[in-house]
Design a protein with these regions (language model features):
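Short, hinge-like loop/turn segments at secondary-structure boundaries
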Residues: 50-54, 105-108, 131-132
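Structural beta-alpha unit
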Residues: 75-113
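Short, structured coil segments at secondary-structure junctions
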Residues: 131, 139-140
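A short acidic, glycine-rich active-site loop
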Residues: 55-71
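Short hydrophobic/aromatic patches at helix-to-coil boundaries
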Residues: 143-147
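Small/aliphatic-rich secondary-structure junction motif
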Residues: 3-55, 79-88
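Short, well-ordered secondary-structure micro-motifs
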Residues: 18, 45-48, 99-102, 125-127
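Glycine-rich, Arg-bearing micro-motifs that act as flexible, cationic patches
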Residues: 112-134
């Protein structure tokens, strides 16, 4: 049914469970997987208009953000490799993670998105996390929500 599944992660425990389930689904379907992380750009209050930021502070933030993004994508990579599922990793900088997830799915030509019900921000919106809700509402391809 699905040949290419995007599995976004934010590094949360719920996302880790979704990664395992998404990889298992991909394996059973003979699909490949793209692991995805939406890296938030430098917060405006650190380098915003009219504010001169310390270059070392900015560099340290960027370094740590990139390391965390790589760690998150590596979690998907490790699970895919262990299951023998073809894998590709993608990181995009975005202030709108839901848009980045949808854009990544389009760019990578995925035919489904397998996403955790909620991430680091908890149970926003009662049942689904706000990012997951926005992906569900705006995606043009099937979205499978793991809870």
């Amino acid at each position: 049914m699905f040949k290419h599944i995007l599995i976004p992660t934010d590094g949360s425990r719920t996302a880790a469970k979704a990664i395992k389930a998404g990889i298992q689904l991909a394996k059973e379907m003979g699909a490949r997987v793209t692991g995805f992380y939406a890296q938030e750009p430098l917060p405006l209050h650190i380098h915003g208009e009219g504010y001169i930021a310390d270059k070392e502070l900015v560099a340290e933030f960027e370094k740590r953000a990139a390391e965390y993004a790589a760690k998150c994508v590596a979690e998907v990579s490790d699970a895919a490799k262990a299951a023998g599922v073809p894998f590709e990793g993608v990181v995009l900088k975005s202030q709108s993670p839901h848009k980045a997830i949808i854009d990544a799915a389009k760019q990578q030509k995925c035919d489904a998105i397998f996403i955790a019900s909620h991430g680091h921000k908890g149970l926003t919106g009662l049942v689904l996390g706000s990012v997951t809700q926005k992906v569900l509402v705006n995606s043009e391809i099937p979205v499978l929500v793991f809870r």
